[in-house]
Each structure stands twice: as structure tokens, then as C-alpha cells.
Amino acid sequence: MVYLAVGIAGMIGALVRYGLGLVVPAAAVGGFPLGTLFINWTGSFLLSWFTVMFTRRPAWPPWLKTAVTTGFVGSYTTFSTLSVECVELMEQGRFGMAAVYIAASLFGGLLASWAGYAAAQPERKEGIG
């Protein structure tokens, strides 16, 4: 069951990534790989959010967590494309842009992950008076 769920979720994640890559082409922003950056940032957010949600809901089946985190989010995000795009930028002599891309990917991903974690926390109500 878990293999099928991971496969189906992985297919969906890959298709969503492909579709977003078509919507945000790199050429539209001076060759900066904004599409991959956006995908990896949102994937970092989603992985943290889902991780917290599954931890807080132990009744949810374990296969669902694996399908969502490893299948969907794992196929949606892409470290290999990040790496290839950095190499391509460096081969074009755009070392500064490659460095910005690496830094934005790392620090933006960490920030997005923190935001996903924070967004999944229970809402805290302030007392009156």
C-alpha cells in the first residue's frame, strides 16, 4: 500500500513542479532560476508544515505521511535542478548570480521551513484583561 501511495503522490508532486516550471520560466527574470527557487521554498514550507501536522495527529495512517512527505514533497522539490542551474550559471560566467541563487535557496529554504513549522502550530489566543 505504501509503495503505491508514494508512487501516486510522487507523480502528482512531479506534475505540479513541472506545471509551475512552465508558469515561471527562468528567461522571464534575466535568466535567474526563479521557478526552481519558488518550488524549493514552497516545498520547504510544506515539508515542515506536513511534518508538524502528522506529528500532532498520530491517528493518521503512517503510509499517508510517507506518501505526502517522501512522495509528493520529495518529487515536488528538486536539489538536482538547483545544482545543474548553478553549474549552468557558472559556465556562463555569472558567478555572482550563482552565489545569490545558492544563498537564496539555502536561507530562503530555512526561512520557509521555519514558516511552515510556525504555521502548523496551534493558534494561541490571548486572554482579555
UniProtKB/Swiss-Prot annotation:
It comes from the Bacteria. The chain crosses the membrane at residues 19-39, 95-115. One of its GO terms (biological process) is cellular detoxification of fluoride. The keyword Transport applies. Na(+) binds at residues 74, 77. Belongs to the fluoride channel Fluc/FEX (TC 1.A.43) family. Fluoride-specific ion channel. Important for reducing fluoride concentration in the cell, thus reducing its toxicity. This is Fluoride-specific ion channel FluC 2. It comes from Geobacillus kaustophilus (strain HTA426).
